[in-house]
Structures are given as structure tokens and as C-alpha cells.
Amino acid sequence: MQSDEKIQAHLVSVWRESKKFFSIGGKEGMLVLTDKHLTFVYKTESRMKWWKAVTQRQVINFIKSKNTMIIHDGYNEQELINDLENKKNIELVFDDISKISYEEKVWGSVLELEYEKYGKQEKFQYAIAQDWVKYPVKEPTKYMKVDWKPFVQYIKDRRILTK
């Protein structure tokens, strides 16, 4: 992330699952959209108390409006830079993304993403969780119906595809 970048959208309680054959489970994290990057942060320095409050606010926000281009108080560009120091978090330049789309499922709205990172082709789906079961493993039990269109369009409008 560059120092002049600004956060354009910040989504929490995002469940990411691989679309590869035989993949099991997923990861919870944040999708953060900046001027030039899409990041998936699942190792954050943010406090648990903040996370719990902001996920509840996000659910209320999505009940009122389905728009995914939202930003949450309490997390800024400097915190994103700090989180991206952890190499487990993923930062994509828009041109790394070979395919981006969204789909409405019966159970919720899904963002589908294909990209190449470190010479490896990856394919994931992302959905925003509303409720969770915590035992025996943390997993979503209910997903939100949201409008991924402005989020996807923001990325598509800024890509310079050279392939």
C-alpha cells in the first residue's frame, strides 16, 4: 500500500473460501478496498472489542442499505499499513485480478475473485457473515444479502489489463 492511498470500502466479518476442488473450510477477515489495491486481512492488530462492535453496526447498516462501499470508524490507512506487514494478509494490485464477479445465492451474496499472486493462480469466493457458530470450529451460519456491484465496478474501472 502506498502512503497516498485512501480506503474506499471496508467490510468486516467476511468469510473467504477457496473454490479449488477438495478445499475445506475458510477464513474470516476484512476486505479493504483502496484507490489501487484490494486486501484481505485476517491477521489484524485491531482489538476484539472494536471488531465486535463494528460487525454489529455493519449488520444494521446492511439491513438499511445493501451498498458495500462503506467505511468503518476506528480503522484507517495507518492501521491497514500495519496489518499488511503480516505476510499472511493478502494485498492485490487491481491488475493481479484476472476475474471478478458477484452472484446472488439463496443463502446470500457472493463476490467471486480469481487472481495470480507469486506465480500461483487462486480462486476464492467471499461472503459477508451475519451469524456465527463458534464450536467446534468458528463458521458462519447466516450470510448477508448485499450489493457487490459498486465494489466490483470500482475495481473493473481501475484495472489496466495487459494480458
Please place each PLM-identified region on the residue numbering.
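Acidic, Ser/Thr- and proline-rich intrinsically disordered linker/docking segments
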Residues: 2-4, 26-28, 39-163
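Broad, structure-driven detector of short, well-ordered beta-strand segments within folded domains
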Residues: 29-33
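The phosphoinositide-binding surface of pleckstrin homology
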Residues: 1-25
